Amino acid sequence: MRNYKKLEFSFGDNELVGQAQTRRRLNKIIKSDRISHAYLFSGPKGVGKKAFAMAFAELLNGVSNMTSLGEQKFSKKSSWFTHPDIHLFLPMPSSFKLNDLKERLELLKNDPYDIVDFSLRPSLSDDDSSKNLRAFYPIDYFRDEIKPAARLKPNEGEKTIIIISNIEQMRERSANAFLKLLEEPSDDLIFILTTDNQEALLPTIISRCQLIRMSPLKTPEIRDALIQKDGYEKEDAQYLARISGGNYSLTKFFDIENLKAIRDDVVSFLRVAYQLDTVQITDMAANWNKNQTREGQIAILNTMEVFIHDLLTYRETGNSRWITNFDQIEAIEKFVDNIPEARLTEMISTIHELRPNLQQYVQAKIIFTVLGIRFFYLMRDKDPEIAPDDNWKHIPAYISN
């Protein structure tokens, strides 16, 4: 049995972005030489859960790749991807095959922060060619692929390691079957699970795992990664990091020119919201619903939040130095002059409140319609007529237009 206490390393020093607290904790876990049979990495999308899970699996089986081990490595494999005892699974739409999964795993081999989730990136050849798909772990996927992998004895490494991304997407039968595996672990098997939505998991699954919480990445961390790892210019990296919402994976694939076009639409949306032009509000909401993928719709919300934050900053300081959209200073000045009493903080809170609904597949056209109508009141320093708990009452405004 490998004695991990003797290893000298800095977890993820070659590849991982931010998450200093999580890195320190994983360092301590491995150096303690008390390895649990199951770990659950929990946190928002795009903060590096899969990347950390892969780096953890590599380190446990002695692979020097994402973490530098030098002469201490005890595997000849170059990464988790080629190691026979490390198996990674993603939830899949029913229409996709295992070959589609292998393509995506190869992308992760080259970039652990690549977007490979079927739900976010249905097509690898053309990111805009299809809408978002729902992806799950149905019982046949679990029975035919995951369970047999978990029964394998280590071939080369210390442990057989099963990484299951987005474990919350297990169907009920799959989750119950998986729980049986989790309840009766073998000594040479480790599960590493990730989730974007811990609340959706069976409590019995959570209780049998060591929980590793991960936070949204900080703006400077994303900015530096975009410059150092992805080759962005400093100005573009700063802008992208500010609108990232702490999601590095999504941000690194943004098209800067497309984002600026989105920003122009956001400014127009705020103008028609101020006028309560319901026809324009619902038309824009329908257009975003139809022509933007889920990540594009999230980018719109992030862009909107940053622009409103710029309004707040400029109103309070009168200094353009501290704003993100500095090239939009004329538009910002006009907004601040025309809506001096706007409840900008409440507008940002409204976005925070509605963003999870978008991530849970509520139709974007409804969410943006609700935003437009509520913004009308908040920009006039008034209480919205429809309470936040009754957002469904905005739906007739959409249907009637």
Segment roles from a protein language model:
Residues 1-80, 187-190, 196-303, 307-401:
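Charged, glycine-rich active-site and insertion segments that engage polyanionic ligands
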Residues 169, 184, 200:
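Residues immediately C-terminal
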Residues 2-173:
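Clamp-loader machinery-focused feature within the broader ASCE/P-loop NTPase space
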Residues 148, 180, 207:
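Conserved adenine-binding aromatic site and its adjacent loop/helix in ATP-hydrolyzing domains
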Residues 151, 176-190:
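Conserved catalytic/switch belt of AAA+ P-loop NTPases
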Residues 58, 105, 179-181, 210-211:
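Glycine-rich, phosphate-binding/catalytic loops in enzymes
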Residues 161-165, 178, 189-195:
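Structural recognition of the conserved hydrophobic beta-strand(s) that form the central parallel beta-sheet
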